[in-house]
Structure formats: structure tokens, C-alpha cells
UniProtKB/Swiss-Prot annotation:
GO terms for cellular component: chloroplast. It is found in: Plastid, Chloroplast. Keywords: Chloroplast, Plastid. The gene is ycf18. It comes from Porphyra purpurea. Belongs to the ycf18/nblA family. Its main location: plastid. The keyword Chloroplast applies. This is Uncharacterized protein ycf18. Pfam families: NblA. Gene3D superfamilies: Phycobilisome degradation protein NblA (1.10.287.670).
Amino acid sequence: MDISNQLTLEQEFELVLYKQKIDPLNLEQAQNLLVETLKTMMLKDNIIKYVVKNSHFR
């Protein structure tokens, strides 16, 4: 079984916190939060790609 696509307990907890943060928002606020979250994920991807590309362990 491939567990790489499963969330850790900590990540599951983080999802619950996000849901609690999103529930009271109106549509526009939720959309803005989504855009900011996606931007953060993209920046994280860029950092990971940079580290892998510049890693001395290739």
C-alpha cells in the first residue's frame, strides 16, 4: 500500500483547523483564502524544487 498520498495525523488536524477557519467566511473571503493557500503551496513547491536541484546528493 502506498502511504505517500495519505495524510499524517498532524495534517488531518490541520485540515480540521482550516475547516473551522473557512466555515464562517463568505464566498469572497473563502475564495481569497483559497488563492492565498494555493500561492503558499506553489511557493513551497518552488523551494522543494530548488533544494532538490541544488542538492549535492544527486
